[in-house]
Amino acid sequence: MTTANLLVELFVEELPPKALKKLGEAFAAALTESLVAQGLVHAQAAVTHFASPRRLGAHIENVLERSADKPVSTKLMPVSVGLDADGNATPALLKRLAALGADASAVATLRRESDGKAEALFMDSVAKGISLGLGLAKALWESLDKLPIPKVMSYQLADGWSTVNFVRPVHGLVALHGTDPVDVRMFGLTAGRKTHGHRFEAAADPIVLKDADSYAQQLESEGAVIANFAERRAEIVRQLEAAAAPLGLVPVEDEALLDEVTALVERPNVLLGQFEQAFLEVPQECLILTMKANQKYFPLLDAAGKLTNKFLIVSNISPADASAVVGGNERVVRPRLADAKFFFDQDRKKTLDARVLGLAKVVYHNKLGTQGERVTRVQAVARAIGEKLGGEALALKADQAALLAKADLLTDMVGEFPELQGVMGRYYAQHDGVADDVAFAIEDHYRPRFAGDDLPRNPVGVCVALADKLETLVGLFGIGEKPTGDKDPFALRRHALGVVRMLIEKHLPIGLNELVSIAFSAFQQGLLGQAHTDVYLFMFERLSGAMREQGYSANEVDAVLSLNPIRIDLVPQQLEAVRAFAALPEAAALAAANKRVGNILKKAEGEVGASADPGRFVEAAERALFAALDEVAPRAAAAFGSGDYTASLQALAALKAPVDAFFDQVMVNADDPALRANRLALLNQLHRTMNRVADISRLAA
């Protein structure tokens, strides 16, 4: 059958920039998926997606002009229902055949075959292939239904009465199969070979496409458009680096901003702008955020990462004289920077300490009170954690940092740029003469804010960050605001993971259960429901997920966490020990034996003794196991006590032979109650020795 490459383009009004990348990818993927399902293209066909501010497109290789005919087997009904005793068609069968467009003459061609329950009648036929025109129309509508459109527009078509819903009005439709247009109509448009280039700089309008493969090249040469999103993005990166390098500077790295400006321009032109040096007195985070969020500029940093007074503009036009474009952008950014400077100057007229009382007027949650009440709770938790980790000195600093941590929420700068909460608190605290470790703790108490984010830089910050997250978790769980499914409006999963990361990566010698108890004690009695266990288990789930993401298997993680370790900062070392143990030749047999021991002890009636009496042993195998335990247990315990979990587990390898012999030669559930109790006590000793680092029975297949 004839194949050729297919090009499809929707020419639209300006698409939402933050959604463009996903729209382009989703359009091409859904279009291809539908064509594959209809048999018009192979599942492995190469696909290129195009997305620019005014177009969505896809280029798909080796698309059929018509899909192949397909043999179809249709089950009709059981033979007993379709044929009478003489083998003639029943009315039920004739009615079913008529519904399929056949008559009584088809009865002789029906096939008999078992359907697994009874013998049934099947009709074999051939489904004619679908033309590309029909298939593409179906694929287009299906793909448009699947687009992740943030907000749909309703607009009227040119006929004056038809209304359609789409992300933006569609003004052109291209569908080329090789050199031939595909007969498709949608949005009141007939597909053709004409498209449009850059709004201002196209050399030709319209652009008449020669064939499907010429699309990208013709758009760039005749239309001044780089249609491929990835290529346009790469060109922006190249130009940014080329503009910054001669100055010895580097543009701020921001992947989201890069995607957004790629979605705002069709052919990028990077230009250099600058502002007055005086604005650099304002914290650079404020200036950078202002330029990125409001103007979509790329601020330039020096080799030390310090902001300079220069920035890069990604323009959509390339005039012979760019001074007007640069000058216009410099004029626009100046008031923005002036506002930031004004906010900074005004905010410093009032200390953070003086703002704290104002938090009593800010509602945090209608069931949990004000931000002022919350600050008091966070202070109490931070003090307690500080006392545990560093004594009175750390507790006092943690208390001060917790008191001031939320005060910057009442500043003009944070009111304008909420993203700067914490950051501005640090600057204002330093201006007020607060010690640096306390000031940095104010900024850092929000960390980690996202996966892979840095942790607090000093112990004071760690105390306040833990306190802030624990107070949030306990408070919201206590009033029933738990995450459900993919809904987590208060980012409680992120908070819990932050606590887990700090405990592990900062090697903090404090138990998770103790931290949860400290946090609950900070709340007024009767304010919260009984949610201690829920919070604890929720955080353990985050710990389990974090360890699996680091490459540990579910069995390895389960083996360690099933013992509910008090110190989760030791969990990674214990997991490494479990992994090393699992590699031993004796591991599988010992894991299976441990599982068997656990099952025996669970079924045992009454209380099982903690240790066996060697004087009651009858069999040589139980004496040998007791002797082996007497030799191995102290070594394993000593290694465990010194933190050498690998050695503690590996010491168990010596138990394989005596354990195997014990189960081969000894009847645990002996008729003599005293003998049975002694053997159960021996197994209890074995179980405790084997399960000190991890429950190795979880490693059993």
Curated annotation (Swiss-Prot):
It is an enzyme of class 6 (ligase). The keyword ATP-binding applies. Its EC number is 6.1.1.14. It is found in: Cytoplasm. It catalyses: tRNA(Gly) + glycine + ATP = glycyl-tRNA(Gly) + AMP + diphosphate. Disulfide bonds: none annotated. Its main location: cytoplasm. InterPro entries: DALR_anticod-bd, Gly-tRNA-synth_bsu, Gly-tRNA-synth_heterodimer. GO terms for biological process: arginyl-tRNA aminoacylation; glycyl-tRNA aminoacylation. PROSITE patterns: AA_TRNA_LIGASE_II_GLYAB (PS50861). SUPFAM superfamilies: HD-domain/PDEase-like (SSF109604). Keywords: Aminoacyl-tRNA synthetase, ATP-binding, Cytoplasm, Ligase, Nucleotide-binding, Protein biosynthesis. One of its GO terms (cellular component) is cytosol. One of its GO terms (molecular function) is glycine-tRNA ligase activity. Belongs to the class-II aminoacyl-tRNA synthetase family. Tetramer of two alpha and two beta subunits. This is Glycine--tRNA ligase beta subunit. The lineage of its organism: Bacteria, Pseudomonadati, Pseudomonadota, Betaproteobacteria, Nitrosomonadales. The gene is glyS.
